[in-house]
């Protein structure tokens, strides 16, 4: 974990800078950080259906707690939702429907970033069997060379285009599409 006060103070050095960071631990955010130039700090609360979070990030804040933390964080700084990674599998839209309903029921309507699953091919050697079942779907995935020369896996672009449209259509049932800053 980082010394966030040090990071935030760095961004105070120049009026043109703004910090933005994603977290899976919004309930552990220290109150003293609220004082540090809140108008120049953006927190992106990472959300995914709890079913996926239980497998992929078992030691992080549970999704409902993350959602419930957002109104408090909004009192102090700009808050976005980071829907990432977006996982595709049978029934995936039902899982995201439940998630969007929970966010809407909490009265949250903020900008968001949406990122479909991309993962490093070498990670497969370290993944548990449950993680592998969720992440590794070679019939619908392809290799992608990253800008850092890593071998990454992502959903095939032809399929992903349709996934993005389905995700956006579902999102639009709950929120204004203009809330999506980017989706890929």
State what each model feature region is.
Residues 101-184:
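Auxiliary Fe-S-binding modules of radical SAM enzymes
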Residues 53-55, 88-92, 122-126:
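Short acidic/glycine-rich loop or secondary-structure boundary segments that cap or lie
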Residues 59-63, 93, 157:
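Flexible, glycine- and charge-enriched loops at secondary-structure boundaries
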Residues 4, 63-66, 96, 160, ...:
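Aromatic/hydrophobic pocket-lining residues that form the small-molecule binding cavity
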Residues 1-32, 36-69, 78-82, 113-117:
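Core AdoMet radical
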Residues 85:
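Active-site clefts of carbohydrate-active enzymes
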Residues 88-105:
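Catalytic cores of alpha/beta
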């Amino acid at each position: 974990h980082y010394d966030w006060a040090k990071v935030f103070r760095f961004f105070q050095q120049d009026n043109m800078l703004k910090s933005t960071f994603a977290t899976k631990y919004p309930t552990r955010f220290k109150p003293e950080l609220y004082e540090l130039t809140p108008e120049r700090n953006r927190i992106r609360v990472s959300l995914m259906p709890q079913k996926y979070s239980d497998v992929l990030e078992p030691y992080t804040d549970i999704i409902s707690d993350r959602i419930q933390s957002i109104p408090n964080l909004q009192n102090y700084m700009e808050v976005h939702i980071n829907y990432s990674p977006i996982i595709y599998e049978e029934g995936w839209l039902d899982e995201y429907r439940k998630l969007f309903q929970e966010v809407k029921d909490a009265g949250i309507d903020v900008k968001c970033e949406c990122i479909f699953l991309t993962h490093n091919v070498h990670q497969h050697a370290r993944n548990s069997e449950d993680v592998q079942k969720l992440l590794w779907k070679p019939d619908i995935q392809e290799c992608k060379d990253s800008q850092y020369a890593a071998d990454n896996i992502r959903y095939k672009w032809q399929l992903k285009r349709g996934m993005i449209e389905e995700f956006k259509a579902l999102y639009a049932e709950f929120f204004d599409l203009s809330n999506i800053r980017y989706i890929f």
